Amino acid sequence: MSEDWEPAAFKTRTDTVLAGFLDEEATALLAVDETLDPLAEALRSTARHGKRLRAAFCYWGWRAAGQPDSDALMRAAAAMELVHAAAVVHDDLIDDSPLRHGRPTAHHAFAALPHPRTTAHDAFAAPPHPRRRPRAAARALALLLGDHLMALAGRLYAESGLPAAYLSRGRPLWAALARELIAGEALEILHTGGLPDTGTSLKVIRYKTAKYTVEQPLLLGALLAGAPTALREGLSRYGLPLGEAFQLRDDLLGLYGDPARTGKAPLDDLRTGRPTVLLAETWRAADPAQRELLRRTLAGHGPHDEPHGPGEDALREVRALMAELGAPARVERMIAGRVEEAVRTLDELDLPGTAHRALTDLAHRAAVRHH
């Protein structure tokens, strides 16, 4: 790989690692039973989508410590993308999101599969033989897919080809990553439908997304490279605010981005009542009548609370209220401040020039984007 940071080439390299690894796993699944083809295809599709930011941050954490390019490190870095793939499958399942990258999410894709025909035994059993509804079966398959992807992330890391002594440095971080990712997702579920609060929402995004998107991949690369404590602490000071900026941008795009570019269903965050910073900032600025509109539209309308949530017109009214009260502009300022903090931190660290340039570019790619 060139010493210069080439995002497209890096993505291709990461995709190649994932495609080979996941194709082998898909083939192994099919050797068990050909009926597992939908699960095998879902694994293969994981290698086709994504910006590969998490792999890039892991790679440049390694390079920031002065280590050279390494194919084995690329495999360890690619494991971060499988962590993300697992988190996405589970998050889409929890939110009942229909689209991701412009394609059906895993549980929606599984639900579209032909349902097995009822057998004569089923039809005439007394009492009738219990059969799982297609929706329940699809959700169960997606749950298993996400679990499998997380297990595969650990396997790809362990089989990366790096020396065992290097890999052992990263094991405590793997444990923290899993704990904090689950904690963040659980915090979001527990706070959905509660009183909006900006501090609470920022804590949710820090643990649900920010840490495993930027800080922890960076630290994993640095740990694998044997980086000193001072460098790791500096990378944390860069990674945490940048990870928050990444998710704040994602929340803005979810409501105000072009669905043709984001590949996600618009209004999903409002429909599920997620405790976003956008919602909290809107609530903070709203008068009593506007707060009543928010309560009436969003309360009790999580994905599994009622069969019919708020209508599109009501959700658009809330989105318009957010803009009217200046919430998107305040979130934009939060993003800009966090990116500035991250880039300023880089200038304080003693980094190789290539790593400094790459991490500066990645900061802008993560937070200033349209999808």
Where are these regions (language model features)?
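A glycine/threonine-rich phosphate-anchoring loop and its flanking beta-alpha core
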Residues: 133-162
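Acidic, Mg2+-coordinating active-site segments of isoprenoid diphosphate-utilizing enzymes
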Residues: 64, 89-130, 154, 181-198, ...
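Transmembrane helix-loop-helix
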Residues: 157-174, 294-296
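Alpha-helical scaffolds flanking conserved acidic
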Residues: 68-83, 139, 168-173, 231-242, ...
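Short hairpin/turn module used for nucleic-acid contact or packing/dimerization
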Residues: 316-371
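A short glycine-threonine-serine/GTX helix/turn-capping micro-motif
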Residues: 138-143, 199-209
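Residue-level signal for inorganic ion chemistry
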Residues: 57, 153, 279, 342, ...
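Conserved N-terminal diphosphate/IPP-binding helix and adjacent helical/loop segment
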Residues: 1-85, 89-131, 135, 186-197, ...
